[in-house]
Amino acid sequence: AYSWDNRVKYVVRYMYDIDNNGFLDKNDFECLALRNTLIEGRGEFNEAAYANNQKIMSNLWNEIAELADFNKDGEVTIDEFKKAVQNVCVGKAFATFPAAFKVFIANQFKTVDVNGDGLVGVDEYRLDCISRSAFANIKEIDDAYNKLATDADKKAGGISLARYQELYAQFISNPDESANAVYLFGPLKEVQ
């Protein structure tokens, strides 16, 4: 479940393919703009935040389409996305990622940091995990957090934005299945 191939499939399926049709298209990113606005506002709708999220997600879609829509049909398949990630991200640090990817990762952090304190603690990590997958035992989630977070993270009270960016970059760019970053989105299941 922690292979690079499965992790990239996981990102497509659970992070971007919000309409669950099996590929990425402009609609996914329009829906993500609204979703992120509501999560960031804890259910409150803010027009300015929505306009900002629409711009961010439109830019992200345009960049993903440019990098990954190899046949220019307006859809990015999992295989196309994997090829693009391999070309642009594998073996690279967060600082060298395309600008839209960096903005998306920072925004993703904001949706996980529900209390807005600048850290993702175990409580927020648990909420993030259960929003995408089914778990019957909290120990499974907590064990994953303990494998993800370093002693310094735990001492600070959670994972900072800079650390989250580093972990996200490793999640999609590092083929090493033993890296602690493989637990960024919780215990993973095999993506079909």
From Swiss-Prot:
Ca(2+) 3 binds at residues 113, 115, 117, 124. SMART domains: EFh. SCPs from crayfish, lobster, and shrimp are polymorphic dimers. GO terms for molecular function: calcium ion binding. Ca(2+) 2 binds at residues 69, 71, 73, 75, 80. It comes from Astacus leptodactylus (Turkish narrow-clawed crayfish). InterPro entries: EF-hand-dom_pair, EF_Hand_1_Ca_BS, EF_hand_dom. This is Sarcoplasmic calcium-binding protein 1. The modification N-acetylalanine is found at residue 1. The keyword Metal-binding applies. Residues 4-39, 56-91, 100-135, 136-171 form the EF-hand domain. It comes from the Eukaryota. Ca(2+) 1 binds at residues 17, 19, 21, 28. Keywords: Acetylation, Calcium, Metal-binding, Muscle protein, Repeat. Like parvalbumins, SCPs seem to be more abundant in fast contracting muscles, but no functional relationship can be established from this distribution. The sarcoplasmic calcium-binding proteins are abundant in the muscle of arthropods, mollusks, annelids, and protochordates. This protein has three functional calcium-binding sites; potential site 4 has lost affinity for calcium.
